[in-house]
UniProtKB/Swiss-Prot annotation:
InterPro entries listed in its UniProt record: Phosphoglycerate_kinase, Phosphoglycerate_kinase_CS, Phosphoglycerate_kinase_N, Phosphoglycerate_kinase_sf
Top EC group: transferase
Superkingdom classification of source: Bacteria
Protein name in UniProt: Phosphoglycerate kinase
Gene3D superfamilies: Phosphoglycerate kinase, N-terminal domain
Catalytic reaction list: (2R)-3-phosphoglycerate + ATP = (2R)-3-phospho-glyceroyl phosphate + ADP
Compartments (UniProt record): Cytoplasm
Pathway of action: Carbohydrate degradation; glycolysis; pyruvate from D-glyceraldehyde 3-phosphate: step 2/5
GO MF annotation: an example: phosphoglycerate kinase activity
Predominant location category: cytoplasm
Assembly and interaction partners: Monomer.
Organism field: Prochlorococcus marinus subsp. pastoris (strain CCMP1986 / NIES-2087 / MED4)
Keywords annotated in UniProt: ATP-binding, Cytoplasm, Glycolysis, Kinase, Nucleotide-binding, Transferase
GO BP annotations, alphabetical order: gluconeogenesis; glycolytic process
Length: 402
């Protein structure tokens, strides 16, 4: 689904226009209210700067946290406005509310090239209900709409979908355009062989993705805690490892489907066990058919790392979603770090397209300092998963077709 983007609009028509830009500024804060990671803010800068440089009046709409439709002083966008002002090196004013007279007066008094941040749209319950009156009020700030919030594109909310009924044109920003190009491109027209690495602790959260990827991939590598549900389904003893007892039949079906479709499904042959769930746990490597007693698997083993690396070396496109083990514990981060390093090397030296599909795998790549070496790092968790599942994202579907 090809959508009109900001880059395809006539630059001269942006001058003096009030542009409502939906951004994803849902950043983590520490206990003293300071931003600990501004990646999402920085990801929106190309779109914001482009509008500033083309003399538009920029009005930003964003959500923060889950205030449940009520004003929550801890979820105001004050720290975001301050950080954005620093990055842009110009003052970004914040409204007291995203709609109403005060906000409208501020958006109407903007000069060309100025930026206004509307207060948290989720302070109104109408936002998540996609209420059209609320959407119309939001739209009244502007002449046109840009969605650059990939992380919220899977939500049919007033600021992602409803506003498009009142603003024309409604187009994709640079970040959203890039996300769609890589993620949609990897699914619709990848360079082959295409491999997906799916990790994480639960099969249940990745069922849709695994099922969808079996129709598209040449190889699927599975790691993380979910491997033990597959092993248990094969009748193996997994000790005290995490298992979803109600998903055993599903695991069997996924393995059978892969076999029928000729997709190479790779599970680890060895794992790193721990005697307790702790960063300082005693550990040992075990073959998957030799796990017993009180031990639990917290990472993939060295033999599996080599097998996975060899399998990935044959691929031209690789999508990674979910860690190989409990990478938050250094002792059990080897599998995840090895995959991150392998992808960085393949991307740098072999022109392999490497896509890190949101969530914990992004955190793992950033922790390893390898983010810059990947072809694309997705800013969306749930949105990435839904796109990989082949679902239509409401915030994207609402935009003007190219």
């Amino acid at each position: 689904m090809s959508k009109l983007s900001l880059s395809s609009l006539d630059k001269s028509k942006l001058e003096g226009k009030k542009v409502l830009v939906r951004v994803d500024f849902n950043v983590p804060l520490n206990d003293s209210g300071q931003i600990t990671d501004d990646t999402r803010i920085r990801a929106a800068i190309p779109t914001i700067k482009y509008l500033i440089n083309n003399s538009a009046k920029v009005i930003l709409a964003a959500h923060f946290g889950r205030p449940k439709g009520k004003v929550n002083e801890k979820m105001r966008l004050t720290p975001v406005a301050a950080r954005l002002s620093d990055i842009l090196e110009q003052k970004v004013n914040l409204t007291e509310s995203c709609i109403g007279e005060e906000a409208l007066a501020k958006s109407n008094s903007l000069n060309n090239g100025e930026v206004l941040l509307l207060e948290n749209v989720r302070f109104y319950e109408e936002e998540e209900k996609n209420d059209l009156d609320f959407a119309k009020n939001l739209a009244s700030h502007a002449d046109m709409y840009v969605n650059d919030a990939f992380g919220a594109a899977h939500r049919a909310h007033a600021s992602t979908q409803g506003v498009t009924k009142f603003l024309e044109p409604a187009v994709a920003g640079f970040l959203l355009e890039k996300e769609l190009k890589y993620l949609q491109g990897a699914i619709d027209a990848p360079k082959r062989p295409l491999a997906a690495i799916v990790g994480g602790s639960k099969v249940s959260s990745k069922i849709g993705v695994l099922d969808s990827l079996l129709d598209k991939c040449d190889k699927i590598i599975i790691g993380g805690g979910m491997i033990f549900t597959f092993y248990k389904a094969r009748g193996l003893d997994v000790g005290k490892s995490l298992v979803e007892e109600d998903k055993l039949e599903l695991a069997r079906n996924l393995e059978a489907k892969a076999k029928n479709k000729g997709v190479e499904l790779l599970l680890p042959s060895d794992v790193l066990l721990a005697n307790e769930f702790s960063p300082d746990a005693e550990s040992k490597v075990s073959q998957i058919d030799a796990i017993s007693g009180d031990w639990m698997g917290l990472d993939i083993g060295p033999q599996s790392i080599k097998v996975f690396q060899n399998a990935l070396a044959e691929c031209k496109t690789i999508i990674w979603n979910g860690p190989m083990g409990v990478f938050e514990f250094d002792k059990f981060a080897e599998g995840t770090n090895a995959i991150a390093t392998t992808l960085a090397d393949l991307s740098s030296f072999s022109e392999v397209c490497t896509i890190i599909g949101g969530g914990d795998s992004v955190a793992a790549v950033e922790k390893a300092g390898l983010a810059e070496k990947m072809s694309h790092i997705s800013t969306g968790g749930g949105a990435s998963l839904e796109l990989l599942e082949g679902k239509t994202l409401p915030g994207v579907a609402a935009l003007k077709d190219a």
